Structures are given as C-alpha cells and as structure tokens.
C-alpha cells in the first residue's frame, strides 16, 4: 500500500477531502478521530491526569486550553499520545496492506515528524480568510486557541513547500474534484 499523508493548517479542508476520498472507496485514517477514540479509554484518561495534574478532571476543553497555553503540558501530552497514535497508524497500514492507497490525515504531520511514515505527502491549503470563515462555524471555535494553533503549526507556505503535492480547497467543488483526480493520477504512477 502506498501511504499518503494529508496535512494542512487548521480549517484548511483536510477532513472534507479525507471524507471525500473515503466516499470514493479509498482507505482512510483520521488522527483527530483516532485521538478522540483514545480519549474515551479510561486508562488513557488516567494517564493524562497523572501527566497533567493541573487538569483535576478529564475534560477535552480544559485539555485544549492547557496545552495551547503551556508548552511543557503540550509536550508531555504529545510525548504520551503520539506513540499511541503511531501504533494505530501502523495498524491501519497493516490492515490495509492489500489496498493500492491509504490516506491518513495528520494535522501536525511535519511538526510531529510523522512524514517518515508516508510515501507521499499532500498539503491542503486555502486563504486565511476562508480558514477563518470555516473555523468560526465550528461549535468548539475559540479565537485564542485558533491563534495559538497558528503559532504552533508550520506556516501554510512551509507545508506546501515540503509536500509532494498541494490541493487548494478554497475553490468550487468541480475544481476541487479535478485537483483530487490529478492527485490520484500522480500517486498511481508511483505504484
């Protein structure tokens, strides 16, 4: 299986494109959904509370607030959760070894050095204005966290420069589908 990593800035359209690929029958993996599942595990919750005692109780909102305002807390959580995420990603790749392609959405792919797990990387991008419009429609939107995420992540330009392919999600659906079709043609040549 050719492993394709999908990355991009916050609200750039990564999940939309991943879901589109899943609808087309491709195997997909979403890091954010995987982490949400891990957070449901009581043993994971217990470990996080031990690592971050300032939380007092397990609450996703409090975790977000803490890790985006405290570099040490973010590093502790990442050092704990990333190995679990890598295990799930490796399992996804093993379970889908007979598929031609597997797409995995990893928001912090470069920042977390996950690019080494992929044969090909795609960056999804759009204008800052469009990203902000998308972000404010989310129920969990918080402008302070949005700005902290922007500080932590590599710039869109850096992600595009590092990627093997880039998709502009700030276009109409027809143009977006054409870009995805081109991506499939490009990666099919790698087989």
UniProtKB/Swiss-Prot annotation:
State one molecular function term (GO): dephospho-CoA kinase activity
Entry EC number(s): 2.7.1.24
Q: Catalytic activity annotated for this protein?
A: 3'-dephospho-CoA + ATP = ADP + CoA + H(+)
The pathway is: Cofactor biosynthesis; coenzyme A biosynthesis; CoA from (R)-pantothenate: step 5/5
The answer, when asked if ATP-binding is one of the entry's keywords, is yes
Q: Entry's InterPro entries? A: Depp_CoAkinase, P-loop_NTPase
Q: Which NCBIfam families match?
A: dephospho-CoA kinase
From the Swiss-Prot or TrEMBL record, give the protein name: Dephospho-CoA kinase
**Gene that encodes it:** coaE
